[in-house]
Amino acid sequence: MSNSLGKLFQITSFGESHGDCVGVVIDGVPAGLAINVDEIQVEVDKRKSRAKAHATPRCEDDRIEIFSGILNNFTTGAPICLVIWNKNIDSSEYERTRSKIRPGHADFTGFVKYGGFNDFRGGGRFSGRITAGHVMAGAIARKLISTIGIEVIGYTAELGGIVAKLPKTKDIRQNISQSDVNCPDLTATKKMLALIQQAAEEGDSLGGVVECLGLNLPVGLGEPVFDTLEGELAKAMFAIPAVKGVEFGAGFEASRLRGSKNNDPFSIQANHIRTTSNKCGGVLGGISDGMPLQFRVAVKPTPSISLSQPTVNIDTMTNTSLEIRGRHDTCIVPRAVSVVEAMTCIVLADLALRAGMIPRVIKQ
């Protein structure tokens, strides 16, 4: 398995869905960064469901424990180890259906890849549960990039085909705080919640789109040709279970435009070179151009549904059917927002360190 991401700001994820714990080790964090457990806990708590309609019945406390790397609320420069203990575990449903591979999950590929020795309970290493570690690391990264003024905002842009109308950037964060699905369009929020409730009653699930903005990025983040800003972000996004697509700026829409319509004209704005539009999503040649970073992440419907689905009994090699009765979300899109934000912060922290924009010791 490959469980590490990043070069200078490097995270190593560990744990399984129904194991003792999930966690992360973070290497390369500069010494002297002011951070306390409450700041990390705030980010982890954002990952929890706010509305019963789309919430998993598995309610974990998710209290963070700091094992190393932080002393008296400052980073020491040593590896930071953060852990969350799994306490609310029920593996009975997975034991009952162990021989039946779940459609849409990694049961089949994981079984073949690891010879049947992989932890199948709750999806094991393939579960969204492991993203709790990503979010803890993202909290450290968020604090680090804030020292050079970078801010990251994510939100639900689409859910079950309902598309949000986006307000001005300055209003997005306030509106998100009032939405149970992390959507800045409060009218769309009501429709999304109703649709989630309907899907839950039908035993089905929903997907959607998370949009993410990176504000105040300096020009120069990204290491062409193989560690571009887009490339590193895309790799990080695809490490999130359920992500099936990523597009930057105009994305696939750009393929339908002429160059005269797709190009972002340059101009001088407040003594800085900027563009008058942002179809490139803040990235040119794999390098940040000083405009807002903007990209979208497609999240598939939760594959665990209670409807009967055709599948295979991997022990007897016969066709069969499966009805999943476990504890699952109807829609994970609202919860994925915090994970997308976290992974974005991690990538930006790594690239900022590689570009020499953040010192190895943070002086207050």
Curated annotation (Swiss-Prot):
Cofactor(s) this protein requires: FMNH2
Residues bound to FMN: R125, F126, S127, G285, K300, P301, T302, P303, S304, R327
Protein residues bound to NADP(+): R47
Superkingdom of origin: Bacteria
Pathway: Metabolic intermediate biosynthesis; chorismate biosynthesis; chorismate from D-erythrose 4-phosphate and phosphoenolpyruvate: step 7/7
Biological process, per Gene Ontology: amino acid biosynthetic process; aromatic amino acid family biosynthetic process; chorismate biosynthetic process
Details of cofactor binding: Reduced FMN (FMNH(2)).
Catalytic activity, reaction form: 5-O-(1-carboxyvinyl)-3-phosphoshikimate = chorismate + phosphate
E.C. number(s) listed in UniProt: 4.2.3.5
SUPFAM superfamilies registered for this protein in UniProt: Chorismate synthase, AroC
Stored InterPro entries: Chorismate_synth (IPR000453), Chorismate_synth_AroC_sf (IPR035904), Chorismate_synthase_CS (IPR020541)
GO molecular function annotations of the record: chorismate synthase activity; FMN binding
Keywords attached to this entry: Amino-acid biosynthesis, Aromatic amino acid biosynthesis, FAD, Flavoprotein, FMN, Lyase, NADP
GO cellular component: cytosol
Pfam families: Chorismate_synt (PF01264)
PANTHER family per UniProt: CHORISMATE SYNTHASE
Known role: This reaction introduces a second double bond into the aromatic ring system.
Subunit structure: Homotetramer.
Family, per entry: Belongs to the chorismate synthase family.
Descriptive protein name: Chorismate synthase
